[in-house]
Amino acid sequence: MTIQVQQLSPDVCVAPQLGPETMAALADAGFKSVINNRPDFEGGPDQPTSAAIEAAARAAGLAYVHLPVAPGVQTPEEIARFAELLAELPRPILAFCRTGTRSGKLFRAATGG
């Protein structure tokens, strides 16, 4: 299974939509935490739910946080929470959304990068 990952810093990466089936591979690749920035059902009923992804992540030994952010402009509160997660979660961290763009924007806004 190939997972498209974009490295934003030495220990933070972003990726497009991930599902429960990818969590063990992320743990095997050395990731310690996953941040899901995609609201449930944003892509319709076939999109995996946060609960399903969280269960698989925790079973694989990963820390998991669901911080749903709508496409477009991120709020100051969402940016602040993302910054808190970057400071609190075990690294390396992988954040994802539909394409990875939203997660990348959150990272840049939260870090000034």
Tell where the protein language model's regions lie, with residue ranges.
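Cys-dependent protein tyrosine phosphatase-like superfamily
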Residues: 1-93, 102-113
